[in-house]
Amino acid sequence: MSVETSIANGIAEIVLDCPPVNALNSTEWLDLAKNIDHLSHNDEVRVVVISAKGKGFCAGADIKELQEDSTKIADVNDGCWKTARAIHVCNVPVIAACHGFVLGGGILLAGSADLVLATEDSYFGLPEIDRGALGGGAHLSRLFPLQAVRKMMFTGKPISAKRAFEYGSIESLHSDIHSLHQAALDIAEDMASKSPIAMKLAKKALNQIEHGDVDEHYKSEQTFTLELYKSTDSQEARDAFVEKRDANFHAEE
């Protein structure tokens, strides 16, 4: 099972469980979006906590699926956009409890959430530039300052959770996954005790006054992802990643 969902005391927990690195395929992204949307309209749910099992939070999209069928890029983009938007417009607050790696689509989950907590050993990044892809900049910009975002996008290098905490990008740091989970639940319990209508309107108000529309920005960003995906360099990057070798890029007109 790639995603586990449970509801107790007003708190819905979504746990990613897709070994080995919680990289989701196109169907799993679409299912996750539907799951979050369903929870958003469930009167029993007052807050959602997203976490993961395994070595890390989420490594993004399943590159091997795209390698086997390049036409899946449209479905992957659609699923990623719908998932990110479902979190952003969810009627209740969404908390992302991150451990280990938070990469690619993992940035979409964290960057769409209302609150991010992380373990001290976790790190955040968009390695897409080395995978023949783009995307995630809109949500990365909700987490980090401009210079950090551009360096991360252009180099593919991640930022540590400790650096992210210094930026104010995450709410708190925790020594291990157990203390992380407990901290997320403690905050969730506090939120769940508030007036449902007040929380719903508070989130809508915050989304409304936020600079720009992250959902539209991400949709626009995906047009460049598709443009890059059609290039020979994009295919070469994916081939090199799967074959575990250095890529050989060429200038294109």
Regions found by a protein language model. Give the residues of each.
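C-terminal alpha-helix plus adjacent terminal tail
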Residues: 1-9, 43, 156-162, 181-182, ...
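Glycine- (often His-adjacent) and acidic-residue-rich active-site loop
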Residues: 4-6, 38, 44, 51-86, ...
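Conserved CoA-thioester-binding segment of acyl-CoA-metabolizing enzymes
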Residues: 1-53, 89
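Crotonase-fold acyl-CoA enzyme core
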Residues: 88-196, 231, 236, 245
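Terminal peptide-recognition signature
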Residues: 14, 32, 50, 62, ...
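Hydrophobic alpha-helical membrane-association signature
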Residues: 28-32, 76-79, 221
